[in-house]
Each structure stands twice: as C-alpha cells, then as structure tokens.
C-alpha cells in the first residue's frame, strides 16, 4: 500500500523559449532518446516536444536526462509501444523552458475534463437490440489553481503577463518525495480578488492542457 497525500505540492510555470532545437529522430526506448546536436540540450533542461510523426508524443513536456554524444534522454517517456509509436518518429523540434516561477499561497487545486466520450448505437442484425458503445474522444483537461491575493508576489505580475500574451507555457507540479509532473498548454489568470466577509481575498489561475502530463519520478 502506497497512499500519497498532496500536502506539500507546489505548482509553477515557465514560458517556452522560441529557439527551436532540431531532433532528427526519437528512439523507441524507455526512456526515449532524442537525437540532437551536441550540447544543445543539457541534463535537467525542461523541454516541449513537437513531433508530428508521433502524435502521441506531440506537445508534451518533460525533463532531459543523461546526455551522450548526439543524444539526450527524455525522462518519463516510453516509446516502445508499436501501436502508439509506429514506424519511425521522423524529425521534430525541442523547445526549452525559460525560468520557472513557483507559486505559493496556493489553495486546493481542482481538475476537470479527461472524461472518455462514446458513440452509442445498435447493430441492425442484433435481435436483442442491445446498445453498444465505441470510445471517441476525451474532453480537454483543465486545472484550476486558487491563489490567495497578494500583488507583491512575483507570480502575480508573471501570471498577468502570461494571461495577456496568450502563449502556451509549461506547468510543473513538484510533488512530495521528488516526483514531478509536467504539462504544456495555456494558462489564464484572473487577478481581480474575490471578496467575502471573514475570508482571505483570492484569485484564480486556470490551465488548459494541450496533451497529457509526463511524470518524471524522483530518485
């Protein structure tokens, strides 16, 4: 049994550097290896992957692991499934995260979306008229982050700036024990404080993911 409580989790976010780092291919391995120019990606860099040839990996964010000549590990990524990752990856691009801004004075986050949707119907030849369902798409995932109002905090102006630009960012959740989750998507922020008697004023950041998270496990 390994129950884990979220107490101590800290969210943060970072802009994405516009400079594109070409990758000629990504291997089928766990963790996957990206072929890049020597010294273009360092161990510990957080990167977004743009890889049209493997849609299951496109728009996902992770941390770079060990480097070797011309390759770097993409931690938390397993590309050995030949259904999800058929053939070869083809060329793509990595983009590094800028400096992360950590959030504090956090309330309890809430998540929504990700629910599987279905097509429902019956088959004409089935005399029982039994209904069948086929999975279609999943709803977009959102994370809502309550933040207690304090305009002097570094994150306040940084969130306002990100909201105004409307550009995708990398969201990070540092969990107790060293595990880290990374997402890539859009972050909006309402900096106007909520007001209720005998309660701290609050603001709300809302993140919409462009792809599933990547979990990088702690040592």
Task: Specify the residue positions occupied by each region the protein language model found.
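Small/polar beta-strand repeat architecture
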Residues: 3-7, 15-29, 38-39, 53-128
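Short beta-strand and beta-hairpin "edge-sheet" elements
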Residues: 172-218
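Oligomerization/assembly interface segments of phage tail-like spikes and tubes
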Residues: 121, 132-151, 199-214
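Short acidic (Asp/Glu) patches
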Residues: 123-131, 188-191
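Short coil-to-beta transition motif at edge beta-strands of beta-rich domains
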Residues: 36-54, 163-170
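Exposed beta-sheet edge/beta-hairpin loop segments within beta-rich domains
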Residues: 129-138, 158-163, 174-179, 193-200
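Residues that flank catalytic or metal-binding motifs in active/ligand-binding sites
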Residues: 60, 141, 167, 183, ...
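Acidic, glycine-rich flexible loop segments
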Residues: 149-180, 188
């Amino acid at each position: 049994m390994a129950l884990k409580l979220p107490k101590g989790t800290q969210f943060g976010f970072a802009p994405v550097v516009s400079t594109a780092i070409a990758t000629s291919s990504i291997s089928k391995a766990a963790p996957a290896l990206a072929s890049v120019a020597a010294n273009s990606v360092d161990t510990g860099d957080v990167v977004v992957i743009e890889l049209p040839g493997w849609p299951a990996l496109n728009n996902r964010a992770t941390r770079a692991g060990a480097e070797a000549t011309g390759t770097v590990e993409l931690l938390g990524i397993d590309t050995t499934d030949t259904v999800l990752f058929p053939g070869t990856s083809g060329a793509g691009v990595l983009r590094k995260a800028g400096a992360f801004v950590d959030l504090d004075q956090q309330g309890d986050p809430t998540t929504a979306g990700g629910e599987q949707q279905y097509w429902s119907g019956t088959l004409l030849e089935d005399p029982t008229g039994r209904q069948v369902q086929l999975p279609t798409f999943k709803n977009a995932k959102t994370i809502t982050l309550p933040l207690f109002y304090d305009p002097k905090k570094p994150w306040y102006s940084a969130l306002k700036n990100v909201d105004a630009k409307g550009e995708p960012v990398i969201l990070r959740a540092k969990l107790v024990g060293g595990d880290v989750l990374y997402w890539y998507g859009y972050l909006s922020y309402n900096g106007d404080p909520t007001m209720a008697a005998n309660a701290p004023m609050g603001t709300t950041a809302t993140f919409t993911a462009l792809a599933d998270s990547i979990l990088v496990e702690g040592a």
